[in-house]
Structures are given as structure tokens and as C-alpha cells.
A protein has these predicted regions:
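Extreme N-terminal starter segment of soluble prokaryotic enzymes
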Residues: 1-5
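Generic enzyme active-site microenvironment
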Residues: 6-7, 11, 51, 98, ...
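Short, glycine/acidic-enriched loop or turn micro-motifs at the edges of active sites
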Residues: 12, 56, 148, 174
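Acidic/histidine-rich helix-loop elements
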Residues: 15-25
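Active-site alpha/beta core segments
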Residues: 31-140
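Histidine-anchored nucleotide/phosphate-binding helix
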Residues: 33-40, 150-161
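Short acidic-hydrophobic, aromatic-tinged amphipathic segments that line or gate anion-handling sites
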Residues: 98, 190-197
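A short glycine-rich beta-strand->turn/loop micro-motif centered on a GG-aromatic cluster
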Residues: 142-145, 164-178
Length: 197
């Protein structure tokens, strides 16, 4: 049985020490994340989805999120760029991307999951994409990225709600105020979510 992988918001503004909303310790994850992705095997991996936190200045300024965090991940800027190139993956592993405008990748209607390599695979509506994964026998999703207590937490919540088992490698995520062990203990007691080293 194959697993699926979601890489949450591994973007410059979060991962780099001089990013607009740098997550403490995230810069140290870049090398291990690249090595981990490079080591995925196509026989065991149904695909990898890269999420992109994506903002437009005028819209962001009026958002709830702007009350808590400074502007970050403005589309088309260096801070929006993914620090993990899909070329790291075995070519036989499908690579996908989704742009979201809020913490929760499940909250917005109409989001499309698109090919991350430019291979001209047609976009797929988000919910239909995950339905297809389940129909194909995918039961477990591994989630890595930042921030553990925001966008990673919401990614996990949506997966659990859709019946997936979730695994979060603790060494491949960092939080802002809470780390993943605390997030899972406080927010997902009894859920099908585990951390691994």
C-alpha cells in the first residue's frame, strides 16, 4: 500500500532566518527535508503535495490573519518561493501543488491541486483529489513542514476528518508557540495521528 505526503508551506518567509515570518528552528529543517524527500520511493509513495501560503497585499491587510502576523508569502516575491524543489523527488512520484490564502488548506472553496512539475497534468479540485486518493487505496498521509501549530495543524485536522491516518515526523516540523507533540496531545487526543522521530 502506498502513502501520500503533504509538505506544508516550506517557503522562504517561514523557513529562512531572514524571512518575513521566520519560524524559529525552521532553517535547520531545510537540509533534512531535502534528504527525506530525496529518499522517498515510488513503490511506497503515491505522490507529494506542496502547499503554498499565498497572499496579496491589499487583501491580506484586511484579513483576520493580518491582526496576528505581518505580511508574508506575497505571491511572486522571493519570500513566497518554495525552498524544496520537486526535482528532489524520484521522477516516478507525482508532484502536486496547491495555493491557499488562509491557515486551513481545507477552508476555501474552489481550490485546485495542480501539477508541480509543469507536466501538463490537468488541475483537480482539492476534495475530488483526496477522494481519488482514498479510492486508490491510500490510507496514510505523512505531513511535514511549518508551522506545526498553524498550517500543519489544520492540514492534519482536515485529513483526520476525511478518514486518513496521519503521521508527522517530529524532526521535520517546527511550531511558533507549540511544537507538534503538544499540538497532537492537546488538539487530537484519540485521533489516528502519530509522531515519529
Amino acid at each position: 500500500m502506498q502513502d501520500f505526503v503533504i509538505v506544508v508551506d516550506a517557503q522562504y518567509d517561514f523557513m529562512a532566518t531572514d524571512g518575513a515570518l521566520s519560524v524559529a528552528g525552521a532553517d535547520a529543517l531545510v537540509g533534512p527535508m531535502r534528504a527525506w524527500l530525496s529518499g522517498l520511493e515510488s513503490e511506497r509513495t503515491a505522490g507529494v503535495l506542496f502547499t503554498f501560503d499565498t497572499h496579496v497585499p491589499d487583501i491580506y491587510a484586511a484579513s483576520e490573519e493580518a491582526r496576528e502576523f505581518p505580511a508574508h508569502c506575497v505571491k511572486g516575491t522571493p519570500g513566497w518561493a518554495n525552498m524544496l524543489d520537486p526535482a528532489l523527488l524520484d521522477r516516478a512520484i507525482p508532484a502536486w501543488r496547491i495555493e491557499k490564502h488562509v491557515f486551513d488548506m481545507w477552508a476555501e472553496d474552489g481550490l485546485l491541486i495542480e501539477d508541480a512539475r509543469g507536466d501538463a497534468m490537468p488541475p483537480v479540485p482539492r476534495d475530488a483529489f483526496f477522494d481519488r486518493l482514498k479510492d486508490a487505496g491510500v490510507r496514510r498521509v505523512t505531513v511535514i513542514g511549518v508551522a506545526a501549530d498553524y498550517c500543519v495543524r489544520w492540514a492534519v485536522a482536515g485529513l483526520v476528518a476525511r478518514g486518513f491516518q496521519v503521521v508527522v515526523p517530529a524532526a521535520l516540523t517546527r511550531g511558533i508557540a507549540r511544537q507538534i507533540d503538544t499540538v497532537l496531545a492537546e488538539d487530537f487526543p484519540g485521533a489516528a495521528v502519530d509522531t515519529v522521530a
